[in-house]
Amino acid sequence: MPPTLALLLFLALSAVAAVGGAGDVRRVLHEPLFPIEWTPPPSTASPSPPSPDFSSDPSTPATPVDNGGPALLPPPPPNTVAADVSSSRSGPDPRARGGGGGGTPKAAIVVASAAAAAVLALLAFAAAFLLTGRLARHPAAAAAQAHKPPGHAHAGAGSVAGAHADVAGCSTAVSPYRKVRPERARRGMCRDVDTVPSPELRPLPPLRRGASALTQGSSDEDAAYYTPGQRSAGSGGGGGGEGGGTWSEASASSPRTTTASRRSLPSLTSDFFPTTPAAAPVPAPAAAAPPPAPPAPRSRRTPPRTRFSAGSGAEMNKQMASPPSNPPPAPPPPPPPPSRFNNTTPKPPPPPPPPEPPTGPVSARRLLRPLPAEGPSIVIPRAPAMAVTKDNDATAATMSVRTRGEAAGDEPRPKLKPLHWDKVRTSSDRDMVWDRLKLDEDMIEVLFMNNSTAVAPRMDNPKKVGMPQFKQEERVLDPKKAQNIAILLRALNVTLEEVTDALLDGNAECLGAELLETLVKMAPTKEEELKLRDFTGDLSKLGSAERFLKAVLDIPFAFKRVDVMLYRANFENEVNYLRKSFQTLEAACDDLKGSRLFLKLLEAVLRTGNRMNVGTNRGEAKAFKLDTLLKLADVKGADGKTTLLHFVVQEIVRSEDAKSEKAPENHITNIAKVEQLRRQGLKVVSGLSTELGNVKRAATMDFDVLHGYVSKLEAGLGKIKSVLQLEKQCSQGVNFFATMREFLKEAEQEIEQVRHDEKAALGRVKEITEYFHGNAVKEEAHPLRIFMVVRDFLSMLDHVCREVSQQDRTFVGSARSFRISAANALPILNMQGQKGGRESSSDGDSPSM
């Protein structure tokens, strides 16, 4: 309590002095400004406490002094302010003082009022501070304070200032940021002077746990590392260190809202009330007294008194040597500080590894403090984790089994085929379905082994090292081509001896056209042929395709013989096809010229066209091109359904009925008989398509293609002649040349006959074209076009005949009148018979209407 009263008294006096100083400055503002230069005093090892810059507002907390940074003087203010202050303090002009004598009572009243207000505000602030500190003190900290001896209560409070003064003196020339903080705080740029200069100097905060675990862990840590027994074994500054530790407990457990106000007052106490020589701790060398690591902080900022500690090296060694006490189920106490902060302490006996708690963020100003480099460093091994999940157990077991297998000299696991999936990370804090799954890895390796890796062990087998790889070293043909040849040979089911005998004798019937075509496809290139001929090794080293081609190439001009034999095998079929095609063309010309029904249809179209073109330039025509037949279906009647082709078909049907009808005069024909005759006439018209079947087949031919086939046969004869010229160069296979010589004579005769048939067919086609088109035959680009036109017309005629057969004598009356007027050879009936016939016909037509 005495330090608190001293603090309040000092603050009151400072406020009065500040108000008085402000009044003096205000009275000398009219004085001229003199450029007074200010020289900063040299920095000393023992820092002097700077005068705090208090505000007259009691609600604003005082600016704390950083004990962790260097204790340097603040930078000088501008020259104008320094001149005013220095002039006012050194003694203003007597005229100014004399002139202000009249305002002394007013100034005294103002000073007294301000002092009274400041005292009241400070008393209220002190009461609130004490009340808040008592309520916010953690129960565990209060219990630790209660267990202290009675003598330590005052010793700790009295040695706080000494400890902080020592720490401030040790870190005077460390931080360059100490120079600008008072100026920034004076200008109001920042309220907290403890701002960390760079975020890279501050490590990441640990993972947060529950509030209860943190609170319990904090109390355990305080009880383990800040005990009176440990302080008694230290140096003379142990009391100060204990006081600092007690203050850290209160600051760490206090709420966040009161951190700024509580952070500033203890630093002021240590700065403005220096300790006596008896209470001041003995300064220890930097190499013997490194600061211990603070407990895990509750926030990102560390309170001022928890940044440094005044403990000695012996105290730290004692803490590291003594194992931590076994706590209740709460988390274990924190480990000793890291080795980078203790690299100057002597090496103690190795302590048992304590459990590692979550590491809090290290203060940035501690990182800025230079650490000596000499002395061995202590490396504290970390204890293994206490809790192991199920999946970690399974993974560890699997890895251990694989490690033992590899250590025992087993073969490496083969590479399997990949499975592309979306990998999900399993959680270690909950039970999942994947923890219960088991796989048969041996079966997976058997089923899904990669072929490239599966072949490698077999190739490296020492039993097969001595055997040469014939398929890779002795292969001549392309692998794909050799495989195709082997497949063809198995499909044809023929032996090598049969092929060689047929080639030597020239017997094409023995092999057949299919096998000869396959041999032509097997023909190697010139490079492959040279390799096969020059091969002198063991034939068993070659594949089946290479052995077959090697045996065939041993025959002179083997593949030329194959071409000639294939020509001979196909010659007869090709000649027969050409002869049949030419005969079809001649038959089509004869059928088209001699068809009576086709000529009658042309007559009906000509008469109808002349009747429709009366009075025009197209009228009175004597002939028309057959292409007009394709336009009959485009001319439609008034009803929109009946076309000109329908009408022509009906007229041809009735004309056929009239020829088959042989009734006497004045005889009324039976309606059923007329219908029957009508159907017969329709069959006759529809039979035109069958009658001109050769025309349809001729329309599918191309005369240029037929001429190309004939030319190909003649070229084949030239190949036979060239092979026969090689007879003198061959010592074997004489029967082949004799057989080919006989075939050549027969083939020449056949080709001459085919040439004659071709000319005859072409002449007949030109003749039939002139028969229908006259001199327009010269305009035809395609010689067989006339057959294609007739074929298309016949398909249209069949379609119309099917439609007419479905109708029920729709145009009987109009067709009969047209028939009577057109056929003059029919007998003229008397009026009565004609009327009776008309009545009967009308009666027969009425039901159908």
Curated annotation (Swiss-Prot):
Pfam families in the record? FH2 (PF02181)
Mark out the compositionally biased spans (Basic and acidic residues). Answer: 185-194
Q: How does it sit in the membrane?
A: Single-pass membrane protein
Q: Which InterPro entries match?
A: FH2_Formin, FH2_Formin_sf, Formin-like_plant
Q: PROSITE patterns per the record?
A: FH2
Q: Which UniProt keywords apply?
A: Membrane, Signal, Transmembrane, Transmembrane helix
Which stretches does the entry tag as region Disordered?
36-104, 185-364
Know the name of this protein? Formin-like protein 4
Q: Which organism is it from?
A: Oryza sativa subsp. japonica
